Each structure stands twice: as structure tokens, then as C-alpha cells.
Amino acid sequence: MALTRLVIRDFRNIEEADLALAPGFNFLVGANGSGKTSVLEAIYTLGHGRAFRSLQAGRVIRHDCSAFVLHGRIDDGGGRERAVGLSKDRQGDSKVRIDGSDGHKVAELAQMLPMQLITPEGFTLLNGGPKYRRAFLDWGCFHGERSFFTAWNNLRRVLKQRNAALRQVTRYAQIRPWDQELVPLAEQVSALRAAYSEAIAQDIAATCSQFLPEYALSFSFMRGWDRESDYAALLERHFERDRALTYTAQGPHKADFRIRADGTPVEDLLSRGQLKLLMCALRLAQGEYLTRHSGRQCLYLIDDFASELDAGRRRLLAERLKSTGAQVFVSAVNADQIGDMVDEKGKMFHVEQGKIAV
């Protein structure tokens, strides 16, 4: 699977760009602030419905414009080309078009364009809050199990309703109807996450052993409530506490996926360069797992490739990315930083003040 064409209009500092893309490596080279990250962000937005540097639509729409428009052509790997499009106005209203028809959902774009994002801010996967690691697990569940998205979406809805009800009820019997809906959803989502974390742990360990052979890494999934407790009984037992807090304190919305190096949390032991390498290993392992189990490739978006990595680590990452056979988009300040990746099959774009040239 590869994005063969990308059209960008009024996104960040890019007025208009029409890019024919290589199926392998695509390099975006330019000074800081030139717009190279905006190209990566446009690709990410086309596959997610939102940008990775801002959740507010108005901030990514070009100054004095009412909306941004993104179009893409996808080679699905089976000899079929798909057309996708996304527009969003300053009020946040989106329009999704797939193969010429309107009325589609952003989740359909995400299903068609699985992608892994590696940015200088991506350390949050390792040293940020549990929500970043839940998102990592949920990406894998979403692309690997079709029932996951519906269950996850319903879980979020019921949790929101239960938390609102906690502000109004006085007895547990009044909130039991929400719990009767919440419990099976919580157990379904948790079971899918647990199965995925167990399945991918071996892939992560193998990739990490190549990237960080000096450490013994271990991985553990925590579902968000006590392992020995029945969730329905726990909700009833802690009703008064939840009512005082006005939110549900335990459940799958508190799940986590922890990584330790030699028994110590990685964020307490590894250097920034090692953390970035570990983050890259996690993203690579997840993408390769998807390919092996579904036959589908994901896109890799790498912003500021050289950040935190010395020449040896850059070379190692370049070799692993090449071995995937996936489409890769890489931004760098100058061509010297990506020398280990460049070959005759790749394509280099020079970006300057929102203008993009081959």
C-alpha cells in the first residue's frame, strides 16, 4: 500500500502543492519553518482527520482561508487505485470523500491509511501519561480486529454518560443501568488489548534486541483495574468514591502498557537517544506486525530524522526501514542527515516557505 499522489490546498503555510510520490522513500528537505513538517502533517491529517501538532482545525488552515483541502491517491497493493479526500473548515466541520462519493467517516480513512508517526515529541509514548500507550495498543486493535472500534466508541460514550450521572444520583441502583452496559464493553475492549499486547510483545522484543542489545526489556499490560476483581462488583463497591470524585476511577480508560529495561522503567534509565531508538523500535515492530498478520503495509512518517540520533543509530534505523519495503516520508534540515537512506528509488523534495520542488 502506498500513497501515489498528494494534493494540498491551504494547509498551514502551503497554498497549493501537487506531489507525485515514490512508493519507497520520500525525503522532505528544508530549513526549520519551511513547511516540510506541514507536508507530513497533511499526510497524517488525511489519514486521521486531525493534525498531530494541533487539535484545532483553525490553526492548520492557511491564514485568511476558510478551509483546507487534502486529496490523495492510494495504490492498495492489489492493483486497485483508491481516491480519498478530506476538507475541514474553521468550525471543525469535516467532509470525507472516498472514490468520488461523500458522506464517509474519518475512521474509514484511518482504516485505508494505517501509518506510524515518529516525531521529536514522540517520547510521550514512553515517558508521557498512560493515554499515549493506550493509543499505541488501540492502533493495533483497530487495524487488527474490526469489532474493536465499535466497542471502543461505545465504551467512551457509556463512560461519559456514567460520569455525568454520578453528579446526579444518590444510590447505586440509580446508576446500575449504565454499569450493565459498561461492564461487557469494558471486558471486550480489555480482552482485545490484552490479546494484542501479548501477541506483539515478541515482535517488540526482537526489534528492541537489535536496537538496544545492551538491555533486557520486559513488557506488561495493565487493564486499568485489579486483576483479581470482577469489574461489575468493583463498580458497585466503589460507587460512593466515584460519586465523590464525579468520575469513574477504574476501568479500561485507565489501562497502561509499561516497558522496563533491566527491571527499571525505561524513562528512568535510558538516555534521550536510547528512548528515541526504543520509540522507533516500537513503531517499526507494530508496523511489521500489521504487515505479517494482514498483508497490509503502513506508512511511516518521520519528522526531524536526525534529532537525538548519532550516525550509527541513524544508519541502523535506515536499514530497518528499508527492510520493511514500506512507504516512508522523512523530513530533515539538510540532505547530509539522510544520506544513509537515499537511493535511486527514492524521491527528494526541497521545501522553502511553503513551496515544494523536486
UniProtKB/Swiss-Prot annotation:
Please give the name of this protein.
Answer: DNA replication and repair protein RecF
Localization, UniProt: Cytoplasm
- Please tell me one Gene Ontology term that the record gives under cellular component: cytoplasm
* Single GO biological process annotation from the record: DNA replication
Residues annotated for ATP binding in this entry: 30-37
Q: Name one Pfam family in it.
A: SMC_N
* A single MF term (Gene Ontology): single-stranded DNA binding
Q: What does this protein do?
A: The RecF protein is involved in DNA metabolism; it is required for DNA replication and normal SOS inducibility. RecF binds preferentially to single-stranded, linear DNA. It also seems to bind ATP.
* Disulfides per UniProt: none
From what organism does this protein derive? Answer: Edwardsiella ictaluri (strain 93-146)
Keywords, A to Z, come to: ATP-binding, Cytoplasm, DNA damage, DNA repair, DNA replication, DNA-binding, Nucleotide-binding, SOS response
Family per similarity comment: Belongs to the RecF family.
